[in-house]
């Protein structure tokens, strides 16, 4: 019913003049959403489900789009999914199921459609490049030998040389991308390094004393031997996952309305940690329609904490509740019932947030994070079974992460509507 209320004109226009009768976008979209909401993600499994499952036959209007049609539709219209998410939230608001206020933010590592064993490190690429060049030189010398040494049966020198030269070209391309990433990283680290130097110098001038502590370490230019690129999905990154070990992943971010548990915005990034993800999410939240209400507070764990993030929330007129340190396992039993001293006049945004987190209301709101955004991520991964992206590339996985969020929201709306 919700899909029938969505404005799909942009999708419909894309099919005009195709020459052959096509499945209606609403049918294909419904099939995909129902699949992601019930743990059926692959296009071949979706096609088979339209034959085997009564529920899928109903959703697909007893039609049977093949896997190629479903997969092409999914890839083609990924950019439109985020707009459809907003439409669904507006429908939920009209049904009085959501009104923005307090939002919780969290991130989770989602496996990429690539094996970590397909990764090539910069150090290994140098060794492999040297080895292949030596092999090519030996093969060329063998080809030019005047005594026409006998070759092993089935061995073709041109083919062997061409195969190694192809690998050398692929390695050179991979090295160039690693070097480009290293240059970008160096520029960012150099800017941070210079800012720290300027801060030390300014403080020294203010106090008239030499700077205390060790000076910041200057960044190193160029790639490190351990810098790597994945040859299957070069935009994915090696990340540490819960339970131990490392996998080829993306970092999927979700912002959840704390009352309805509906996902209001998502983001997918290549960074392992969450510290740089507050400001991008604030920009996304700012694009939500006024009809949904205004985000009043943003709740996040200590992985998101930095002074810059707290100040960014203040500039957006959003109250931050970001843990500044991990919670103690055995806190003082009186702490929960003791109000903090009054906040001093002229307190900074960070000091105001620290004070807020010690108040009864602040503690209660922050505690809700554990029963809002964390369960949503848990359900997406453990109940819906979405633990790995099917698509490759940052732009594509962002669209697929939106599709997951859209499926979750429709599933959640069904529960909220009773």
Regions found by a protein language model. Give the residues of each.
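Secondary-structure boundary/capping residues
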Residues: 8-11, 59, 294, 389
């Amino acid at each position: 019913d919700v899909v029938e209320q969505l404005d799909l004109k942009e999708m419909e226009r894309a099919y005009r003049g195709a020459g052959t009768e096509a499945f209606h976008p609403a049918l294909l979209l419904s099939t995909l959403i129902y699949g992601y909401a019930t743990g059926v993600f692959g296009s071949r499994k979706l096609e088979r489900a339209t034959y085997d499952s009564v529920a899928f036959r109903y959703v697909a209007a007893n039609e049977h789009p093949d896997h190629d049609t479903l997969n092409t539709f999914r890839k083609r219209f990924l950019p439109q999914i985020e707009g459809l998410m907003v439409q669904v939230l507006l429908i939920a608001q009209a049904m009085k199921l959501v009104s923005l206020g307090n939002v919780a933010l969290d991130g989770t590592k989602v496996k990429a459609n690539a094996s970590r064993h397909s990764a090539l490190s910069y150090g290994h690429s140098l060794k492999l490049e040297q080895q292949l060049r030596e092999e090519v030189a030996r093969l060329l010398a063998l080809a030019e030998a005047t005594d026409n040494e006998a070759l092993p049966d089935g061995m073709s020198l041109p083919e062997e040389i061409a195969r190694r030269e192809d690998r050398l070209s692929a390695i050179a391309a991979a090295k160039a991308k690693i070097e480009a990433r290293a240059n970008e990283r160096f520029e960012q680290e150099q800017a941070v390094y210079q800012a720290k130097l300027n801060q030390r110098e300014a403080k020294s001038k203010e106090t008239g004393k030499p700077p205390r502590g060790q000076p910041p370490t200057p960044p190193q230019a160029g790639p490190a031997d351990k810098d790597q690129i994945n040859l299957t999905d070069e935009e994915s990154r090696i990340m540490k996952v819960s339970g131990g070990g490392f996998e080829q992943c993306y970092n999927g971010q979700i912002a959840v309305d704390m009352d309805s548990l509906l996902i209001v915005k998502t983001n997918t990034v290549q960074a392992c940690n969450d510290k740089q993800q507050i400001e991008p999410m604030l920009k996304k939240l700012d694009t939500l329609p006024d009809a949904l209400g205004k985000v009043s507070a943003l709740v996040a764990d200590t992985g998101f904490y930095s002074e810059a993030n707290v100040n960014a929330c203040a500039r957006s007129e959003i109250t931050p509740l970001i843990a500044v340190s991990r919670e103690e396992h055995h806190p003082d039993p009186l702490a929960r019932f003791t109000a903090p001293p009054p906040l001093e006049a002229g307190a900074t945004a960070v000091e105001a947030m620290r004070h807020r987190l010690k108040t009864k209301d602040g503690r209660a709101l922050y505690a809700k994070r554990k029963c809002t955004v964390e369960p949503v991520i848990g359900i997406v991964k453990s109940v819906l079974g979405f633990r790995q992206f099917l698509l490759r590339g940052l732009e594509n996985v962002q669209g697929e992460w939106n599709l997951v969020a859209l499926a979750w929201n429709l599933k959640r709306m069904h529960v909220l509507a009773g």
